[in-house]
Amino acid sequence: MARWLSQFFIKAMGVAVASAFAMSVSVAQEAKELRVGLLATLSGPAAIFGEHMRDGFMLAVAQSNGALGGLATNVLVVDDKLDPEHAVKQVTKLIDENGVDVLVGVNFSRVMLAVHDPVVRSKTLFIGTNSGPAPIAGGKCNRYFFSTASQDDQVHETMGRYASLKGYQQVVTIAPDYEAARDAVSAFRRHFKGQIARELFPRLGQTDFAEEFNQIAEIEPDAIYAFMPGGMGVELVKQFHTSGLKGIVPFLSSNTINAITLPITSEMGEGLFSASHWAPNLDNPANKRFVREFSRKYKYAPSVYAAQGYDAAKLIHFALELTGGVKEQEALISAISAAPFESVRGDFRFNSNQFPIQDFYLVEGVRRTSRLYEMEAIARVFDDVGDAYAGSCRM
């Protein structure tokens, strides 16, 4: 009996030691590296948006000493060239050849709509850091996709609500003549209770807005709402400044006045309004550290695109600290769902469609010094709000 017990304990100890060794090998192998694919627009006129997003993400990686969640982190940065077909080829390579554990990024909706399905079909965890098209927030939502940005309509809805809160009755809208811009105007109308005096849709690429401003002057609206991204927006702001309307007709906008265009428009963008879920003056410790260290490292002021990239890396970091690795994907998805991190925007949690529930602000272009202009949050317009499409999401 004693001999049998002795042999039993020897065998049990052997199994325990072997199991412990196997577990330690498994953990060691898993902990070796985290592979992240970062897809951004990094060439052409829109490259600055991707650069901000990339730099924000990489700052958070640097703050973790190159090891998100304690895992040595290899970030594979890929330029989507704002080309949906090229982007699909790149994400396929990142998944099939590079074996990335997580994909992050995407600046523009037409790229996001192209890459979303192949990524989630592969069951690769995907964290969007800017684009949030309605289908992905609604009927095509997927448990493998999260967003640290917002749903695309929300900034336009914020300006519509603000216009109503101000009591504006007559608003002229101006946006380029393409589908996404018309969608932006529709989103503005969703929360604006007054009347649209006129919708102006200049052709895409137009740079002379004299006729549009003549029409606005004749109508004498309570406000202008502009959705005019990129170079068109810069020209619109410059010509608004010289039109004689500045200081008379309030200029409300989305994706027109921001941290990227304001250094170009400088005093011409001062005093003009936009909407955002983030601004450099949001008063919380995480944001103060982000703004300070981003400016110090990159020698330029961060934008919302940088903030969204930064939050994505922080989200991954703290989720991995909970799970200890990426091997158990279900555990990692659950950890990310809990949003266990301090966002630069303050209050942050995920909705049922895995897009954020967050605050939205009226932001204004302000002058800090003779050469420094930045966006400043001056009023909260929405408090802890989700998007209009979450109810259509079925996971």
What are these regions (language model features)?
Residues M1-R35, R394-M395:
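Short, low-complexity disordered leader/linker segments with a strong preference
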Residues E33, G37-G56, V78-E85, N107, ...:
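Extracytoplasmic "Venus flytrap"
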Residues E33, I48-M53, Q63-I136, T148, ...:
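Beta-alpha junction/loop-to-helix N-cap segments that form part of ligand/metal-binding clefts
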Residues D80, I127, S131-A134, L204-G205, ...:
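Venus flytrap/periplasmic-binding-protein-like
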Residues K89, A134-P135, N142-T242, P280-R289:
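Extracellular/periplasmic Venus flytrap/periplasmic-binding protein
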Residues L94, N98-N107, I127-T129, V172-A175, ...:
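Periplasmic-binding protein-like
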Residues V237-Y310, E321-T323, K327, T369, ...:
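Extracellular/periplasmic periplasmic-binding protein-like sensory domains
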Residues R296-A306, H317-M375:
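Segments of small-molecule ligand-sensing domains
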